[in-house]
Amino acid sequence: EMNALRGIVKDGAGTTLYNYFTEFGLAQISVDFLLGTAGTLVQSKVREVLRAIEDNLLGESMTDVHALVSREFFDKLIAHPKTEEAYKFYAATGAQPLRQDVRRNFPFAGIVFEEYAGTVTLSTKATERLVPANEGIAFPLGTMDTFTTYGGPANLLEAANTLGLPLYARQHLDEKGRW
């Protein structure tokens, strides 16, 4: 599901099998927040992300925007001069950023930023970060069909013309079809 947010399909070794943006002829929208530059207007970058998502809803509606960001991105975001005050006064909402770990939820200018450090172990025994360093993935919440999962019937004779299930389990049959 994380790779679906990124628009790619990978195999167990981490090799990209499909890039949905190239497969469907879409342009991936990327916004450089320039968090290393003190003069960057971070709110304007956030609005750029929000407008890009709103412009591409294709008739859908949304309630919120959530962003899963890398550790490095989150650290730069909360240390940036344009967001530091907002993070410090985040305590007005009940959070205590000077005393508590609030990496799970920092709303700023219309996006809820969440530090996400998920990894996956590949078949090569190496690990791969699901959100690359200094990057993030923003997506809409509260839509009707954006994150719907569809399943089809298994490739089994007894599953033909049936509704798909999330998981199929069965014992291995011998060559004559016996258990």
Each model region followed by its residue ranges:
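Glycine-centered secondary-structure boundary/capping sites
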Residues: 7, 25, 57-61, 110, ...
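Intrinsically disordered/low-complexity terminal segments and short unstructured peptides
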Residues: 14-15, 36, 118, 123
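Extended, solvent-exposed, turn-rich assembly/linker loops in the middle of proteins
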Residues: 16-96
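Sequence/fold signature of self-assembling virion shell proteins
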Residues: 85-179
